[in-house]
């Protein structure tokens, strides 16, 4: 396929979908950051109940794209403007990208685990590679109580452009922080959730822990931490959270999030 599009630097979720647009319109924040990309790609996807994989070859150019509006309900009510878009490096590259996801268990009343590995390599104006792994476990406990644990980690190699760093903030990573507040050449992430109720309606409490930066300094860096609670409807199909950053560099704030297809 050929394309000329706004592209998200985020590895998690889909920042260009409906839920991101709703949060931007109501609350003035997004799940980006974004850059402009134009090029061609060809790929292959396969999905079964237990295995999902995709691989693609691409050739594309990247450049920065300015934010065009600050309009939101929160902005009209006096909230400050959202941060500017990222300053992406202007490059032309060709490369390969792929993702493999394995799942064990499908019964929501039993242990369900997943494992994912994803990576990318590019050559051209810059030469770089990215590699990350992650896993999740969701388990029912007792008295309609359930829990989930998610972890992931990744690193990069070579001359990584700004738009291919890791951005570890948002509803799928560390909630309540700005999209460009936790970024670096390597990262780690741990998320825990506890929920009580029935699939149609659950109350949820959560904690997010993560950090990003240079690999050599990642182990000694203070993590970013957020905690909060929320409501899950229809087994996570619709989710509303109130999150609070409690530790990390930069401003700590409350954030209300609406999103779809949550883990619990």
What residue ranges belong to the model's regions?
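A generic beta-sheet turn/junction motif
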Residues: 48-50, 196-200, 233-235
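Conserved active-site loop/cleft motifs that coordinate metal ions or position small ligands
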Residues: 203-206, 238-243
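A short, acidic, flexible beta-alpha connecting loop/helix-capping segment that sits on the rim
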Residues: 244-249
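One face of beta-strands
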Residues: 55, 131-135, 205, 225-229, ...
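C-terminal outer-membrane beta-barrel translocator/porin domains of Gram-negative envelope proteins
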Residues: 1-45, 72-217, 261
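A short alpha/beta connector and helix-capping loop motif
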Residues: 217-231
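Outer-membrane beta-barrel "beta-signal"
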Residues: 229-237, 252-264
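Aromatic- and glycine-enriched pocket-lining scaffold segments that form the walls
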Residues: 42-70
């Amino acid at each position: 396929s050929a394309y000329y599009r706004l592209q998200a630097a985020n590895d998690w979720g889909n920042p260009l979908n409906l839920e991101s647009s709703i949060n931007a319109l109501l609350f003035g924040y997004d799940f980006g950051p974004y850059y402009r990309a134009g090029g061609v790609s060809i790929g292959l996807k396969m999905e079964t109940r237990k295995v999902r994989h995709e691989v693609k070859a691409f050739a594309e150019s990247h450049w920065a794209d300015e934010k065009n509006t600050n309009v939101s309900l929160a902005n009209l009510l006096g909230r400050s403007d959202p941060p500017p878009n990222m300053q992406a490096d202007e490059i032309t590259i060709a490369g390969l990208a792929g993702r493999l996801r394995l799942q064990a268990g499908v019964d929501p009343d039993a242990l369900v685990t997943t494992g994912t590995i994803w990576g990318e390599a590019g050559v051209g104006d810059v030469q770089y590679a990215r590699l990350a792994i992650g896993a999740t476990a969701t388990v029912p406990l007792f008295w309609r109580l359930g829990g989930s644990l998610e972890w992931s980690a990744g690193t990069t190699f070579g001359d990584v452009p700004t738009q291919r760093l890791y951005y570890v903030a948002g509803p799928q990573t560390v909630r309540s922080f700005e999209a460009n507040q936790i970024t670096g050449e390597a990262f780690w992430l741990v998320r825990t959730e506890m929920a009580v109720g029935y699939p149609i309606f659950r109350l949820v409490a959560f904690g997010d822990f993560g950090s990003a930066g240079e690999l050599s300094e990642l182990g000694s860096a203070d993590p970013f931490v957020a905690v909060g609670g929320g409501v899950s409807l229809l087994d996570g199909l619709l989710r509303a959270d109130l999150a609070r950053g409690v530790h990390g560099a930069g401003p700590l704030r409350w954030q209300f999030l609406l999103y779809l297809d949550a883990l619990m």
